[in-house]
Amino acid sequence: MPNKNMTNKLKYILYQFLTGTVGNFLVFLQPKKARRLAENRITLVHKNKKNLSVSERLMRAALVKKLDKIDDYNQIAELNRGFWINNATELFVETEDGFETDFLPNCTFIFDLLKDELGDQRAAFSTLVEIGTGNGDVLNYLSSEFPEVNRFVGIDLSPKQIELNKSKFNDNKKLEFVAADAFDWVTEHGHSNTIFVTSRGVLEYFLEERLQDFFKEIYRLGKSVFIAIEPNGGGHNFETSPHSQLYGNEPSFSHNYPRLFKNAGFTIWHFSQKPWLGGYDKQTFVGAKSF
């Protein structure tokens, strides 16, 4: 029997074939709908397929394949940053079911491992910071999983989303939401005895050099733990290609997270990967600590 990775790869190849034939034909037949689907590059890439019909899914995939290739890393970083500041709220609405369909069944195990890793030191960590908090659901969940932590800070580039989160979670007094650049916030407000978290696609928008500097800045704070749940390109082999690569259609960056954490001084206590949302790319789980 073929293994799971081979099955996923075959599904991926079949899907690419269908989008290249049926999808392109539908785009030709329905140009107005195609223009509506393609209004924003990143929204097009991430659009929640559950809200689309089968024909719209094939059209979307065909349009994604037609996107102009971008090779300038600085341009990519700026385009993505601009999107997350100005247009992220609409995308969070599109993908809000991800907390129930992806995070809860596929990602919560690493926080159980974190509890075991911290052991009797759990009480020493007074603050948990989620970088790229999005709609705040993950931060709210973590506040119930780590009752000994007094302060939960959610940082996001989108001022509009932060205001929505403040209203949505007004009853949870442990939560704070801040519209800021994560690097700037950590430099000004970061301190020791902090757990840092990213969930399902945040660090992928950092340039490699900036991400390395960010990890070093956190390491300098003192005692800290970092949980990174981040996507990687399906073909990114960290041993043969140790540096960051472009992946996906936004595109964003597939980083060698273990290498970057180690270079900053952290110890890796957990590393694992699994297929991301049943596709060819991988979801990577890293637990790192500075002590």
Task: Annotate the PLM regions.
Residues 222:
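Mobile active-site "lid"/loop adjacent to the S-adenosyl-L-methionine
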Residues 193:
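Short acidic/histidine-rich motifs immediately flanking catalytic phosphotransfer sites
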Residues 202:
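Hydrophobic adenine-recognition pocket in adenosine-nucleotide-binding enzymes
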Residues 197-198:
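A conserved beta-strand element that flanks and buttresses the S-adenosyl-L-methionine
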Residues 2-189, 209-213, 217, 225-291:
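Class I (Rossmann-like) S-adenosyl-L-methionine-dependent methyltransferase catalytic domain
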